[in-house]
């Protein structure tokens, strides 16, 4: 068993990775700004440029990876940014990219994914469509630690 103790006065530094849908990001930033979420969010990284307005509004550093040569280059940039900002925890807020095993292994038990459906019932990017096709009347979200790559 592994555990880690931390002072409660210490506020975790959290980076948020997001793709083009920014409603999850908006909620996290609002809750942090209002004091409901006790952490710092000094960094937002996206594989799209259209989400830049929220970080600008909240005064948070925004770094798009849209000019990366490939997935490996994008992940290297992300790792560098996480190190520069001394990030403790990474939140994937509708980040629609599959992270490599190498990336995940660099941040053991420090990545939380917010998935836009009830797992394990609806896996993947089209979970709303899957729920609709099954006649589901109530949808929600699931969050979980990312500790290994399924593929």
At which residue positions do the language-model features occur?
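One-carbon transfer enzymes
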Residues: 1-151
